[in-house]
Amino acid sequence: MLKLQNYSDNILKNIHLEFNKKQNFIILGSNGAGKSTLAKILCGITPSDIQIENQNLSSYNSKERTKLINYVPAKLEIFDEYLTLNEYLDLSKLHTLLESENMLKLFEIERLRNKPCQQLSSGEQQLTMLASAILHNAKITIFDEPTANLDPQKSRNIFSLLKSKLFQNKIIITHDLNLAYKLQYDILYMKEGEIVFFDSSSKFFTESNLNDFFGLSVKRLDNDIMVNL
């Protein structure tokens, strides 16, 4: 479904990646590992020879690309200071008014519908982007640190959404080991611009790998929690 071969730049080194239909995976790594750089290549923000459905992404027109892949950044960038939350959700024009209303209720942001996006808190902006991503319904959705600005309760709610079938295929960028461990999706682990592991969650979260990648700073306490010591 998605393929990137032998890509290198000033940050990434010899990246080879294939992503199949109905596969969800997590791009995991510390800050500065190259996670967001790779994500911008995968969604076409940074030019490359990436292929989706056996065709170069650049060969699709904008409408086709919109249906194929969607990038949800860690921070909402709005250049129109008067654009309201409702207007932001309507930008894609790929959904009905009822669907938009349902998203406002799902994320409990109905009261904010007429508030300019620039005046929303960072957590409210995060929820707005996630609501928009569900409405967008692209074949592949890339989430960049989806729980970064949320309190613990909202983070748990977003975790449930990421585990749900509301999205067709998911790529989730995070440095949060706990989130990655609980989601149990395939793990692509990056270090210093290189992919050093890409396989199942069960194979990644072994005592041997944890020692190799993190030394004594990480330990598995039970079946649900990973901690940084």
Segments predicted by a language model, with ranges:
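Helix-to-loop junction immediately C-terminal to a conserved catalytic motif
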Residues: 43
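ABC ATPase NBD Q-loop/coupling interface
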Residues: 51-64
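Conserved ABC ATPase "signature" region
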Residues: 98-113, 134
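Conserved ABC ATPase signature
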Residues: 116-120
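Catalytic Walker B motif of ABC-type/P-loop ATPase nucleotide-binding domains
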Residues: 141-145
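H-loop/switch region of ABC-family ATPase nucleotide-binding domains
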Residues: 174-175
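H-loop (His-switch) and adjacent beta-strand-loop-beta switch element
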Residues: 187-200
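ABC ATPase nucleotide-binding domains
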Residues: 203, 208-229
